[in-house]
Regions:
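Domain-level signal for soluble alpha/beta catalytic cores
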Residues: 1-140
Length: 140
């Protein structure tokens, strides 16, 4: 019987914390993507070596809106999102795995941007247009 079970990688935050990385900031694990990309690649490789079939990009807490608030221009924002893909690709190549590992974009909910814990209850104090525009900006 063929095994159709596929494994998604695990948390970015836990391995970062184990490595001593301070996640107490607005970008959470995205801070490591910007300031310590080699550590992100190392974590991806660890998940590949553990059997992951899918790697999530390290962009859950990163959004166009948060980066704009930090004064980052559109070109740099695109570079940050591209870097998350490139690191996952490099981890796959460097691991020399024979598996066909897929990369999945990790895009956090609108509520994670709001910083009010509403992602845990799903009650957003926002309009549909605000939520729509938030996600469109991230996808562009």
């Amino acid at each position: 019987m063929e095994n159709n079970i596929k494994l998604l990688d695990g948390s970015m935050s836990y391995p970062l914390e184990l490595d001593g990385y301070n996640l107490n900031n607005r970008l959470w694990t995205g801070d490591a993507l910007i300031n310590n990309p080699e550590l992100i690649k190392k974590i991806h490789k660890g998940y590949i070596n553990s059997g992951a079939d899918y790697l999530l990009t390290s962009t859950y807490q990163i959004s166009y809106d948060i980066l704009r608030e930090k004064g980052i221009n559109l070109e740099k924002i695109k570079e940050v999102f591209q870097k998350s893909l490139d690191l996952a690709k490099k981890a796959i190549i460097e691991s020399k795995t024979k598996k066909d590992i897929k990369i999945v974009a990790s895009l956090g909910p609108f509520a994670s941007y709001k910083k009010n814990a509403s992602e845990y209850v799903g009650i957003y104090d926002s309009t549909d247009d605000e939520i729509y525009n938030f996600h469109c900006n991230n996808l562009n």
